[in-house]
Amino acid sequence: MITTLLRRSLLDASKQATSINGILFHQLAPAKYFRVPAVGGLRDFSKMTFEKKKTSEEEEGSGDGVKVNDQGNKGEQLIVSYWGVKPMKITKEDGTEWKWSCFRPWETYKADLTIDLKKHHVPSTLPDKIAYWMVKSLRWPTDLFFQRRYGCRAIMLETVAAVPGMVGGMLMHFKSLRRFEQSGGWIKALLEEAENERMHLMTFMEVAKPKWYERALVISVQGVFFNAYLIGYIISPKFAHRMVGYLEEEAIHSYTEFLKELDNGNIENVPAPAIAVDYWRLEADATLRDVVMVVRADEAHHRDVNHYASDIHYQGHELKEAPAPIGYH
């Protein structure tokens, strides 16, 4: 009985001490930094403290706020990140703010319009002939479907043309990791090509508004082409690059026809999209015709790079043995 009384006395004393400590804690700790829940453990206390701090930072407009103003978004958003990752504040040469987050000023360039557009690789081997006629066979259904709607045709073309560089760069990236060896810069060159083709697409999306069934066609064609090209590149890189070279030759032809329609007045020569003006460093009063001219020049450079890559393989070498044409515009 004495033992039981002693236990009860110790338990009551412990409860009183805990209550006194809690009162002192509330009196001494500033409310700005601590919010102790009536029920719950340290986990709830930590969560409530972080939420209090986050709310306080949002109200006070702390430096962790990141303004996001990407083109195409509705208005501006204020994103508060615990990690404190902030975008660089970039300005143009004239001091105005750089408004594009998808590319930076040092990634822009002036296209080389003097490139020879008529260069052609004459197919001599069986793989070359197969690649050539495969690409030629794709022109007929494309002409039938799009006819003279060259804006939508360009969108379809660029969704396909952006695939080979990504596939080739991805496979070379894995090969470099697997073999513990450098790529000779070809990973960067091929991914650069894919990004350039994607920028073509983003530009023409500002000009042409594809219909829903054209968007569905893009999804289907891209899915089929990606898997087919992936298998083809694994089996024979020289065949894959040769086919892309011929595909780029067809792109040059397509954009040449686009220019003819613009010159004949069948397509309105609207002002160039703002993204195109900054990406290709065009004049402020540039038009759609100027955009088509620089895009066609890009395709000619991609033609050269892929035929060159195929020639390297045909000569019994690997791409890493030849310096990659990085920044070849």
UniProtKB/Swiss-Prot annotation:
Recorded topology in the membrane: Multi-pass membrane protein
Quaternary structure and partners: Homodimer; disulfide-linked.
Its biological purpose: Catalyzes the cyanide-resistant oxidation of ubiquinol and the reduction of molecular oxygen to water, but does not translocate protons and consequently is not linked to oxidative phosphorylation. May increase respiration when the cytochrome respiratory pathway is restricted, or in response to low temperatures.
Main location: mitochondrion
Transit sequence range: 1-45
Domain of life: Eukaryota
Description of what induces expression: No effect of antimycin A. Up-regulated by ethylene, high light, glucose, cysteine, mannitol, salicylic acid and cold treatments.
Keywords linked to the UniProt accession: Disulfide bond, Electron transport, Iron, Membrane, Metal-binding, Mitochondrion, Mitochondrion inner membrane, Oxidoreductase, Respiratory chain, Transit peptide, Transmembrane, Transmembrane helix, Transport
List of residues binding Fe cation 2: 197, 248, 299, 302
One GO cellular component term noted in the UniProt record for this chain: mitochondrial inner membrane
Record protein name field: Ubiquinol oxidase 1c, mitochondrial
Compartments reported by the entry: Mitochondrion inner membrane
CDD domains reported for this sequence: AOX (cd01053)
GO molecular function: alternative oxidase activity; metal ion binding; superoxide-generating NADPH oxidase activity; ubiquinol:oxygen oxidoreductase activity
Catalytic activity annotation: 2 a ubiquinol + O2 = 2 a ubiquinone + 2 H2O
